[in-house]
């Protein structure tokens, strides 16, 4: 775990980024798995930290990955929180990841995400969208994915199971190994 703090003129608010990084084997299936994991994290951050606990503002889960040559990825969970809840937020983020490492997500949740991926692909990569196609093809090659695999996008996406997602969280994301960047104060690290 690495922690870096930055000053904030607002004494009551802390803006944080919990970054969980690792390595992965580049392939379209693995990239899709990472993207599904990102969306699951986004759902959990919203439903638990924002809706249930009501302690964060503007929560967001991002995914950055680079297949070639580094084979690295990272998830960035970011939000703003009253500094008095910073310790609680960290505990809840660790609980969310632990839960995803040990329990499968529901078939319904995963199926809804897969459907969303297919709709987005159809909408963005239409016959008239040459710039989007070019960008997509460059990104495929840059990330160690093949055009042949992309032609089987639906097959790869549908092959990802709830067990695969749980296994990926277990193998790729450790709740105790993260980078924390924050602007403001943190109860745990400013004691």
Spell out what each predicted region is.
Residues 1-44:
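His/Glu-based metal-binding/catalytic segments typifying zinc-dependent metallopeptidases
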Residues 164-184:
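Bilobed periplasmic-binding protein-like "clamshell/Venus-flytrap" ligand-binding domains
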């Amino acid at each position: 775990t690495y922690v870096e703090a930055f000053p904030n003129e607002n004494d009551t608010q802390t803006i944080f980024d919990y970054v969980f990084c690792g390595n992965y084997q580049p392939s379209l299936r693995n990239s899709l798995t990472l993207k599904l994991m990102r969306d699951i994290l986004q759902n959990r951050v919203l439903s638990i930290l924002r809706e249930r606990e009501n302690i964060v503002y503007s929560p967001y889960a991002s995914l950055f990955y680079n297949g070639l040559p580094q084979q690295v990825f990272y998830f960035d969970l970011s939000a703003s929180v009253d500094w008095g809840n910073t310790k609680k937020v960290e505990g809840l983020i660790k609980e969310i990841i632990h839960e995803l490492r040990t329990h499968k997500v529901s078939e319904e949740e995963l199926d809804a995400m897969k459907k969303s991926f297919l709709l987005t692909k159809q909408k963005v990569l239409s016959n008239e969208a040459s710039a989007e196609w070019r960008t997509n093809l460059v990104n495929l090659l840059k990330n160690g994915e093949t055009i042949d695999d992309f032609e089987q996008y639906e097959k790869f996406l549908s092959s990802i199971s709830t067990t695969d997602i749980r296994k990926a969280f277990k193998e790729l994301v450790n709740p105790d190994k993260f980078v924390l960047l924050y602007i403001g104060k943190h109860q745990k690290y400013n004691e």
